């Protein structure tokens, strides 16, 4: 399971020109589900996302996690993160989970997140437009 996290000043996701999820300061989490992923991996990734220290403390050092900084999560499904780009000029998605598994784990991830922090989401498998102001920029690839 892959989480590409971006520290943002704000982020929103739209479907058919309608905003379906929006946060102010926090983390945009692009979530990719791979074959073999399960709820245990989702739990580990969520704990990493919630505890990853990417927000500045009083001394300007990245020492606070999203909860300590008072931020939120915007979780967006992103199957292209599971792409194999090693060969050729076209990505292969053979490592990606089936749509049913990916949706189940995406739903599980954001539901568990919502129990711990203010969480907004995109819409699984929809054609989405994601807008954000990356703060830093600060972007990390987390994989479990």
Swiss-Prot record:
One of its GO terms (molecular function) is D-tyrosyl-tRNA(Tyr) deacylase activity. The keyword Acetylation does not apply. The keyword Transport does not apply. Its EC number is 3.1.1.96. Pfam families: Tyr_Deacylase. Keywords: Cytoplasm, Hydrolase, RNA-binding, tRNA-binding. SUPFAM superfamilies: DTD-like (SSF69500). It is found in: Cytoplasm. It catalyses: glycyl-tRNA(Ala) + H2O = tRNA(Ala) + glycine + H(+); a D-aminoacyl-tRNA + H2O = a tRNA + a D-alpha-amino acid + H(+). Gene3D superfamilies: D-tyrosyl-tRNA(Tyr) deacylase (3.50.80.10). A motif (Gly-cisPro motif, important for rejection of L-amino acids) lies at residues 136-137. GO terms for cellular component: cytoplasm. One of its GO terms (biological process) is D-amino acid catabolic process. InterPro entries: Daa-tRNA_deacyls_DTD (IPR003732), DTD-like_sf (IPR023509). Belongs to the DTD family. Homodimer. A Gly-cisPro motif from one monomer fits into the active site of the other monomer to allow specific chiral rejection of L-amino acids. NCBIfam families: D-aminoacyl-tRNA deacylase. An aminoacyl-tRNA editing enzyme that deacylates mischarged D-aminoacyl-tRNAs. Also deacylates mischarged glycyl-tRNA(Ala), protecting cells against glycine mischarging by AlaRS. Acts via tRNA-based rather than protein-based catalysis; rejects L-amino acids rather than detecting D-amino acids in the active site. By recycling D-aminoacyl-tRNA to D-amino acids and free tRNA molecules, this enzyme counteracts the toxicity associated with the formation of D-aminoacyl-tRNA entities in vivo and helps enforce protein L-homochirality. This is D-aminoacyl-tRNA deacylase.
């Amino acid at each position: 399971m892959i989480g590409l996290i971006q520290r943002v000043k704000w982020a929103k996701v739209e479907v058919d020109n309608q905003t379906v999820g929006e946060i102010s300061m926090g983390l945009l989490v692009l979530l990719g589900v791979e074959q073999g992923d399960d709820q245990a991996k989702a739990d580990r990734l969520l704990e990493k996302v919630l505890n990853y220290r990417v927000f500045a403390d009083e001394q300007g050092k990245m020492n606070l996690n999203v909860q300590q900084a008072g931020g939120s999560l915007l979780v967006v499904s992103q199957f292209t993160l599971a792409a194999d780009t090693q060969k050729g000029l076209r990505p292969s998605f053979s490592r990606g989970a089936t749509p049913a598994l990916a949706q189940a784990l995406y739903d599980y991830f954001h539901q568990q997140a919502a129990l711990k922090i203010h969480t907004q989401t995109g819409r699984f498998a929809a054609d989405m437009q994601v807008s954000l102001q990356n703060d830093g920029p600060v972007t990390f690839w987390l994989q479990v």
